[in-house]
Amino acid sequence: MDDDLDSVARYLERAEEMRVIAATMADERTRNALLKIAEDYVGMAQTRSQIYALEQTFKAR
């Protein structure tokens, strides 16, 4: 259970790291690629948290 929440936190941390790195990039293509990676990490965090919520719902039944 804690591993699930930890993985969500790690994905969000990585997304923020990508945003910070992207902000320092002069090349627009590189910056956009890093921002896309950040979006993907956020998406993975959302998916993981939804799976966690579903697991908790089924355990409660």
Predicted regions and their residues:
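Long, non-catalytic architectural segments outside compact domain cores
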Residues: M1-R61
